[in-house]
A protein has these predicted regions:
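N-terminal secretory signal peptides that target proteins for export/translocation
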Residues: 1-23
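Sec-dependent N-terminal signal peptides
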Residues: 25-36
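C-terminal motif of bacterial Sec signal peptides marking the signal peptidase cleavage site
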Residues: 41-42
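Boundary/entry segment of secreted carbohydrate-active catalytic domains
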Residues: 51-109, 150-151
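Glycan-binding loop/region signatures in secreted carbohydrate-active enzymes
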Residues: 73, 287-353, 374, 382
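Chitinase-like catalytic core of GlcNAc-active glycosidases
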Residues: 86-102, 108-112, 120-264
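Acidic/aromatic/glycine-rich contiguous surface patches that form carbohydrate-binding/processing clefts
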Residues: 350-382
Length: 382
């Protein structure tokens, strides 16, 4: 008996009770029936449960420098004397820019770029995509927009790339479906185990086939020479993908010694190797917009008690307080901060070097992190 049948019977009984109430017992039964009818009416009118949608969450990426995202761009008051970057704009066949989700307000639609890569969707714990950024959050750019796909774990990369675990093909299906509103897919898998290089190539081959007419761009780590058993064999990847973006940055990083994010000499060697492996029409050289800082001495650490006791002695700490019996103290030290960054001048000098070497396409990581003057010195070939 379904919900509707039960309600009809209860309504009939309650109607009879109302028309011929005899004593308190019948009145009580009538009242109970009426209450049941009301409750069941509400329950039966509840619509079917909608399909569950993964809530939008922020995903930290190792590829992205940590930064606080301001609410909107502001006019800059430069802190140091400026050097003009060039007399005439540099022209490239294509200029790609990456945009992180959450930086939409920083999207400069008037900037001279030919396509945008929207960062991004990530593989979750069980081998499926966590979420996909919505293209409709972007304005109508009248330019191609790529979806960026990442996998931020070496062990997870192994499980989704090695076909024996049966996760690769379902993931490819998800990626193809996620790319439907976009013009192409940008694969940024930076944590591939050494033994999975062959599996990565197979993954790209199957993915490219399933994408059909959609473009496939693959990000690869910077190299200055061929490495044995490299998981990013430039030449082989270029035979599969429509283009390769060489991430020529992070020469120095947060845990290394201070230095350039991408020095000119290092970038020159990276480009020389890339040009020897990848056809010019498929090669994209990536440039950084961001900078990094380093602080010396590095004081965030764990201590053994004897070492900590020596530190307190050296810094003349004699006052130690307790909170719930646990000792703590504070002291001041002088720190030295080193900052290496890029402005319009350094970015354009690096871009000019690439152009002089025969590079026809460049990409920037990422919009919203740049010196805004940089756009005055770039243009896309008509």
């Amino acid at each position: 008996m379904n919900c509707s049948n039960i309600m009809n019977l209860l309504k009939e009984y309650s109607a009879c009770g109302i028309s011929g109430i005899r004593g308190k017992k019948n009145a009580l039964l009538c009242l109970i029936c009426c209450m049941i009818v009301i409750v069941m009416t509400a329950c039966c009118s509840v619509p079917a449960e909608k399909e569950y949608v993964v809530p939008e969450i922020s995903i930290d990426s190792a590829a992205a420098p940590q930064a606080v995202v301001p609410e909107s761009p502001q006019q800059l008051m430069y802190a140091y004397e400026r050097t003009p970057a060039a007399e005439e704009p540099l022209t490239f066949k294509e200029i790609y820019v990456y945009l992180m989700e959450g930086y939409e307000k920083w999207l400069n639609v008037d900037a001279p770029f030919s396509s945008l890569a929207y960062f991004g969707t990530e593989v979750g714990t069980y081998g499926s995509l966590l979420r996909v950024p919505v293209r409709k959050k972007l304005p109508d750019l009248q330019r191609p927009v790529y979806l960026v796909a990442t996998c931020q774990s070496m062990s997870l990369s192994h499980f989704v790339l090695d076909p024996q675990f049966k996760l690769r093909d379902p993931l490819i299906q998800e990626l193809v479906a996620a790319t439907e509103p976009y013009d192409g897919l940008d694969v940024d898998y930076e944590y591939i185990p050494g033994k999975d290089g062959r599996h990565f190539l197979e993954f790209l081959t199957h993915l490219k086939k399933k994408l059909g007419n959609k473009k496939l761009r693959v990000c690869v780590k910077a190299r200055v020479r061929e490495l044995q058993n490299d998981v990013y064999p430039y030449k082989k990847i270029s035979e599969i993908a429509d283009s390769i973006m060489v991430m020529a940055y992070d020469e120095h990083w947060s845990t290394s010694a201070p230095g350039e994010v991408a020095s000119m000499d290092w970038c020159r060697r990276v480009a020389e190797y890339a040009l020897s492996q990848v056809p010019a029409e498929k090669l994209v050289m990536g440039l950084p917009f961001y900078g990094r800082s380093w602080v010396e001495p590095k004081l965030n650490r764990a201590y053994r008690f004897p070492v900590l006791n020596d530190v307190l002695t050296e810094n003349n700490v004699v006052k130690v307080e307790r909170r719930d019996g646990v000792p703590w103290c504070e002291y001041d030290v002088t720190a030295h901060v080193s900052v290496w960054f890029d402005d319009a001048y350094s970015v354009i000098q690096r871009a000019r070097m690439y152009k002089d070497m025969g590079v026809q396409r460049i990409a920037f990581w990422s919009m919203g992190q740049e010196d805004p003057e940089v756009w005055n010195y770039l243009q896309v070939e008509d």
